[in-house]
Amino acid sequence: PQQYTDLIEEHMATRSACGIFDISHVGKFRLTGNGALEQLEQLLSNRISDCCDGHTQQTLLLTDKGMIMDRITLCRESAGRFFLIGSASQADADFDSLQRSIRHGSLKLENETDRLCAIALLGPDADKVLSKVHFAAELPQRGEFCSFRRGGQQCLLTRAGLVSDESLELFCPAATGIAWFEQLMTAGAIPCGSRL
């Protein structure tokens, strides 16, 4: 929803405690295979080779004429593995454009928009709230991400700034999203509406 309780109350949660946002509607894509880096450097506005493994990069998805299609957050796992996050309103168009543009037969493009839940945490207590639920030794710093397994399921945790510069974003299998959301609220997160 765009709002749970009171807009001011939700805003204050992100400034003085921890707000939690369901951002599952954002586009989520995975590109893997030899030549993935080179292919993305032809489709995105930044030099992907400047992004290190385990880091994120804000970039733009371009049309074949060089026009801006969407803002993309790129997570580089390796030169052959990338996770891409696009805006909700452009998710289908982004995937179609990527699919049309992939020229290497060894590359695999997957649309994970409906398969993955996305939850954002924002506020000074975000790290503390997440640490109560996910007992990681270290949480990613700004511009970083990490993968982890929980209950046999692969998850991704980013600090890519999808909601704000300081937000944490959790990507987990859709079937586990409600459980994560409820556990994070029990740990102190206050639900907030999203207009992404």
What are these regions (language model features)?
Residues 46-104:
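Well-ordered mid-protein domain cores that form the structural environment of catalytic cofactors
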Residues 34, 88-89, 124, 175:
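Short, surface-exposed acidic/glycine-rich loop or hinge patches that mediate macromolecular interfaces
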Residues 32, 36, 94, 122:
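Hydrophobic (often cysteine-bearing) scaffold residues that line and stabilize catalytic clefts
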Residues 1-62, 67-69, 195:
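Acidic, proline/glycine-enriched N-terminal capping motif
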Residues 12-19, 23-24, 68-80, 109-112, ...:
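Residues forming anionic-ligand binding surfaces in small-molecule and nucleic-acid pockets
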Residues 27, 80-83, 117, 168:
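Short active-site oxyanion
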